[in-house]
A protein has these predicted regions:
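Membrane-interface helix-loop junctions at the exits of transmembrane helices
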Residues: 25-31, 63, 138-156, 241-252, ...
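Membrane-interface coil-to-helix junctions
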Residues: 23-118, 151, 157, 161, ...
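Start-transfer (signal-anchor) and selected internal transmembrane alpha helices
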Residues: 1-34, 227-232, 317-338
């Protein structure tokens, strides 16, 4: 395609990035960009609290190797900041300068802004590969910035809102022939592998789909065998290196998770607005956890597909000769395969449409075990979704390539897309521009007096009912604890330490500076045992707290 009389790619990137920033502020407001504004993080979704509190305890953990370990949330078991989804790359950067930062500090708002800007910039560059009109590229980039999965994930599973990583992988794929050296190609993919882990490891398989497409096309075109695989080697090596540096393998933590098939994608995912769209009717899911595979294209993109389909029929009936859309057909064929692979991985093994389970394929262990590393396989639908989005915008521009109608159509579709999602935007704006005071169960009255001057919380059970707010109070007052909610289950380890604590209690030994916490129902089961301990006791908020007599004084 011709690239004459076009603005420079860097300028296009900057314009689209600025538009991304405008979209971010329009949806979330300015308040969350204040690093000292943390109430919205705590007084919101359970997972968002996990991310923020993980950062809080990570910054106070002394440096040691691996550098990503947190010592004070599951003491004596250290866990990686990877498993609190605290955006490890940002966590490490800000921990370096932590001595110069105030105690109340968050980087999640800034991360969201940067993500929106990069999403805008790189999507504009992606569309530039297929569309001659810079205006269409700029307008088209907004579809990516406000894509349903981005809006769904941002400030929920915040790290997963950084879907610009998928777009970067697509850019490296479609511009593969433009990259003029194997060294650059290898370095780019290596950096991407490193960044994937530094933000969220689920981006590894998504980016890898496009990387394998690069390797395949290199081989088909007769490129040198070893040099064709260098990007793949660098990507894997960089990803594994960062996992090791951040402590993903520390202490024998299993990367596998339970629930493969439960967290998949529904066959209705591209047309189901879930809670993001408002124009189309919301469709049921086979189970509530299929929200993980939400990939709603939006009313505007679906409109573009209808227009493109009508245009294709019109050209066939009128026998209008086709012009080459891309210089090499292999890209189109591989792109179709990529979309199908992404879709298949996301919907297997639980194939369902709406609330009907069509079939559940039993998977052999040799397949299920590695797939369990990415148990929320529904997320892997995003490459397919962005491929479809790119096709809708690019084919629309191609259909009207000799007129300015394409610009009008894309802008009309964008307005339709924004109208479809406006209620979701408005709801988020209201939440994130409001004040959210932080309050824990330990802040006032008898609980505050009871824990004053203590050094650690010891939970005598494995549930996560008050672990979050306890961890936040502990951060502010220099206290550690033995139980926390992580992205990977370490209940066996926590149970093991609880047995040791119970053995100490059975011997009449209470640790100085420790506050023991048990649920009221557990206390009632063995009331005589706990009452006979030489301990101070407090009963509050359906829990019982114990500490050694005179502890902390």
């Amino acid at each position: 395609m011709s690239y004459r009389k076009r603005i420079p790619a860097k300028v296009l990137f900057l314009i689209c990035a600025i538009i991304g920033a405008v979209c971010f502020v329009g949806i979330y407001g300015f308040c969350i960009l204040d690093p000292s504004n943390t109430g919205w993080l705590f007084d919101n979704d359970h997972d968002l609290r996990q991310h923020y509190i993980g950062w809080c305890h990570f910054r106070t953990t002394p440096w040691h190797f691996p550098i990503g370990l947190i010592d004070t949330l599951s003491y004596p078991n250290s866990m990686s900041v990877i498993y609190t989804d605290s955006i490890p790359l940002f966590a490490v950067i800000f921990k370096i300068i932590s001595p110069f930062l105030p105690q109340i500090f968050q980087y999640f708002g800034i991360f969201g802004l940067i993500s929106f800007m990069l999403m805008g910039g790189f999507s504009g560059i992606l569309l530039r590969r297929f569309i001659d009109s810079d205006i269409c590229c700029i307008a088209g980039s907004v579809f990516y910035v406000i894509s349903a999965p981005v809006i769904q994930r941002m400030f929920y599973h915040t790290a997963l809102g950084a879907q610009f990583i998928v777009i970067i992988a697509m850019v490296l794929w479609v511009y593969n022939d433009v990259i003029d050296s194997d060294v650059k190609r290898t370095v780019y993919w290596g950096l991407l592998g490193f960044v994937c882990v530094g933000i969220h490891s689920y981006f590894l398989p998504m980016a890898a789909m496009f990387l394998l497409a690069v390797v395949f096309t290199q081989l088909v075109k007769g490129k040198h065998y070893v040099r064709s695989f260098l990007p793949f080697i660098s990507f894997c090596a960089a990803g594994l290196l960062n996992l090791y540096i951040l402590g993903a393998f520390y202490g024998g933590t299993s990367a596998e998770g339970y629930g493969l098939g439960t967290f998949g994608s529904n066959l209705n995912t591209f047309i189901n607005p879930w809670e993001i769209g408002s124009i189309l009717p919301r469709l049921p899911l086979q189970n509530d956890f299929q929200y993980e595979g939400m990939a709603y294209l939006g009313a505007g993109i679906l409109m573009l597909f209808v227009i493109v389909a009508i245009g294709m029929v019109f050209r066939m009936v009128r026998k209008v000769p086709e012009e080459s859309f891309h210089s090499d057909r292999i890209y189109g064929r591989v792109t179709i395969v990529l979309a199908l692979v992404s879709f298949a991985i996301a919907v297997f093994p639980n194939i369902s449409y709406n609330d009907i389970k069509i079939v559940w394929f039993p998977l052999p262990q040799i397949i299920s075990r590695p797939m369990s590393i990415f148990r929320s396989n529904g997320r892997l639908i995003w490459p397919a979704m962005y491929i479809l989005m790119t096709c809708a915008i690019s084919f629309t521009a191609y259909t009207f390539r000799h007129t300015k109608i394409g610009i009008a159509v894309i802008f009309s579709a964008l307005i339709f897309q924004i109208a479809d999602m406006t209620p979701a935007f408005a709801g988020r704006y209201a939440v994130y521009t409001s004040e959210h005071p932080i309050k824990t169960v330990w802040d006032e009255g008898e609980p505050a007096e009871f824990v004053s001057g203590q050094k650690e919380f010891i939970f005598l059970y494995t549930d996560n009912d008050i672990t979050m707010q306890t961890a936040y109070y502990g951060y502010l007052h220099g206290m550690r604890q033995n139980n926390y909610y992580f992205a990977r289950d370490i209940e066996d380890k926590i149970t093991g330490t609880i047995k040791l604590y119970n053995a100490e209690l059975a011997g009449g030994n209470l640790r100085d500076g420790a506050v023991y916490i048990l649920r009221m129902k557990d206390y009632e089961k063995d009331r005589e045992f706990y009452d006979d301990l030489d301990a101070d006791m407090l009963k509050s908020f359906d829990h019982v707290m114990l500490k050694a007599v005179g502890s902390g004084q």
